[in-house]
């Protein structure tokens, strides 16, 4: 048995009245917990919020062998999902999923578009609101979403 070896599962805090999409992470948590328990690991589950001190404290107290990162957003904002990996990286804790840098770059639409353009990947023309007066691509009729 490996019960002295802790695995930590982190996920975003979910309201019990949330949408099926939001609640799905709890199904994932149970599946991972069951698999790890079956293999003899001690498992701790931590809902992560914007109080990242709590995550840091749990990491320091439990010293997990590995963290299963199931965080999909923080405080309902996908753009913040790079924060838990950044904490894990700072404490040199191995974890599943992408690191903070790729998550930061890919969850910001404008940052991702700029990176694709710099790499020579064609993207549709775009502009930000402050540049609209200096931009010639906005002439014509559009459907905005």
Language model features with spans:
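Conserved dinucleotide-binding and phosphotransfer motif residues
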Residues: 39, 91, 119
């Amino acid at each position: 048995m490996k019960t002295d070896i802790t695995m930590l599962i982190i996920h975003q805090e979910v309201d019990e009245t949330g949408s099926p999409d939001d609640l799905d992470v709890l199904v994932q948590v149970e599946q991972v917990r069951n698999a790890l328990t079956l293999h003899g690991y001690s498992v701790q589950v931590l809902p992560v919020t914007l109080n990242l001190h709590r995550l840091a404290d749990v990491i320091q107290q439990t010293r997990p062998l590995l963290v299963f990162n199931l965080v999909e957003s923080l405080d309902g904002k996908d753009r913040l999902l790079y924060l838990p990996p950044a904490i894990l990286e700072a404490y040199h804790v191995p974890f599943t999923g992408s690191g903070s840098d790729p998550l930061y770059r890919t969850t910001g639409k404008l940052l991702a578009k700029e990176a694709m353009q710099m790499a020579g990947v064609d993207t549709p023309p775009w502009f930000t609101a402050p540049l609209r007066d200096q931009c010639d691509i906005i002439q014509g009729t559009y459907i905005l979403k």
